[in-house]
UniProtKB/Swiss-Prot annotation:
Residue numbers binding substrate: R22, R29, H141, T359
InterPro entries found in the cross-reference section: Aminotrans_II_pyridoxalP_BS (IPR001917), Aminotransferase_I/II_large (IPR004839), AON_synthase_class-II (IPR050087), PyrdxlP-dep_Trfase (IPR015424), PyrdxlP-dep_Trfase_major (IPR015421), PyrdxlP-dep_Trfase_small (IPR015422)
Protein name in the entry: 8-amino-7-oxononanoate synthase
Coiled coil spans: none
UniProt cofactor(s): pyridoxal 5'-phosphate
Length: 398
């Protein structure tokens, strides 16, 4: 115990009173969509394992093979110990997958956004003497906001997915000398809606802006062969994504021009000062890149499940917001109602996590349903039935 513990405990008690305290729940995984908790098996509707690859035998085999052949750890930063042939191979494959000149692997999605953006935005002051003008969607992921804050720039926030508002803001600042950056997501992780990437590309070209697109929840799921929404729009200036969701593994990437990636190698603190990913993790990424382009049937199945979930929830009176992807929020409102509903779902064998402020705006707490190609229609119907029963039992009206 430290002398500061009473301060922390008082703050924790306050979070608890407001139904905002977060706790870790021990679980064991039994395949991509089954977890065991407190002796019970639950159908998992909370994981981002969108293609069900986290337990795929090809990924397991490649992880074992590369670990046995190349070792367990990488030892240090790539700038200290060098870049392995496995790294070169995976980055080259990733660049081909994304249709870019180059790609760079990083440790996690959070680290990528938090570290890449400050390095990227620094180019404005270096080349123009003025800070970057950064236009960001109001509902961007916390890591994107953190990266902009770490860069010391003031974000110019546009209304969510409102390209008219974005163009108005861009036009207002045409006379300013700083380089322009548009920073947004292709799929928004809490609402499950999509950005108009083609429209963003048009505005970026019209106003001479650099388009940075977070594809964490689109990579593997959307676009031709799962290459993301940027592939439908003719590309963006820099695409970021993760391997920890649809690709079933761990790590993150950015993909863009050779000049941009080379700049990041020299200036991105999260790349320079981080130990490189282990060979086994690189093996998982390599195997996933073999599989993902071939999984059109799984992507179609996943889209059908999402349509079924939205229709079923709507028939029960629940709002699923603007969702058009595999992420389907069941919007409950108050945080305590979301927690009660999540516990009641668990009692019925369903794992649906309550998402509360500050992750989502106050008054929009929800059960975030994340669907997987490993689910089937019967599982979705069971979730809808459990949702109806749980809400009725606890008097939680849509």
């Amino acid at each position: 115990m430290t002398r500061f513990d009473p301060f922390f405990q008082t703050a924790l008690d306050d979070l608890d009173r407001r139904h905002l305290k977060r706790v870790l729940s021990p679980v064991d995984r039994d395949g991509p969509v089954i977890v065991r908790r407190d002796g019970a098996s639950l159908l998992d509707f909370s994981s981002n394992d969108y293609l069900g690859l986290s337990h795929h035998p090809a990924l397991r085999a490649r992880a074992i093979d590369w670990t046995e052949r190349f070792g367990i750890g990488s030892g240090a930063s790539r700038l200290v110990t060098g870049t392995s042939e496995q790294y070169r191979q995976v980055e080259a494959r990733l660049a081909r997958f994304k249709g870019t000149e180059a790609a760079l692997l990083l440790a996690s999605g959070w680290q990528a956004n938090a570290a890449v953006l400050p390095a990227l935005l620094r180019i404005s002051a270096a080349q123009t003497g003025e800070p970057a003008l950064v236009f960001t969607d109001r509902l961007n992921h916390a890591s994107l906001h953190h990266g902009c804050q770490a860069a010391g720039v003031r974000q110019i926030r546009f209304a969510h997915n409102d390209l008219g508002h974005l163009e108005h803001l861009l036009a207002q600042r045409q006379a300013q000398r700083g380089l322009r950056f548009i920073v947004t997501e292709s799929v928004f992780s809490m609402d499950g809606d999509r950005a108009d990437v083609a429209g963003l590309r048009t505005l970026a070209d019209r106003y001479g802006a650099f388009l940075y697109l977070d594809e964490a929840h689109a990579t593997g799921v959307l676009g031709p062969q799962g290459r993301g929404l940027s592939a439908e729009a003719g590309g963006v200036d820099l695409a970021m994504g993760t391997f920890s969701k649809a690709l079933g593994g761990f790590g993150a990437y950015v993909a863009g021009s050779r000049a941009v990636c080379d700049w990041l190698v020299s200036t991105c603190s999260g790349f320079i000062y981080t130990t490189a990913l282990p060979p086994g993790v690189l093996g998982v990424i390599d195997a996933a890149l073999d599989l993902v382009p071939t999984l059109d049937a799984e992507r179609a199945h996943l889209a059908g499940l999402a349509d079924r979930m939205r229709a079923g929830a709507g028939a029960l009176g629940w709002s699923t917001g603007p969702s058009s992807t595999q992420i389907v929020p069941v919007i409950v409102g108050a945080a305590d109602r979301a927690l009660t509903l999540a516990r009641a779902l668990a009692a019925r064998g369903m794992l649906g996590t309550a998402i509360r402020p500050p992750t989502v705006p106050a008054g929009s707490a929800r059960i975030r349903v994340a669907l997987s190609a490993a689910h089937d229609e019967t599982m979705v119907d069971r979730l809808l039935s459990a949702l109806e029963d749980a809400a009725r039992e606890h008097g939680i009206a849509p």
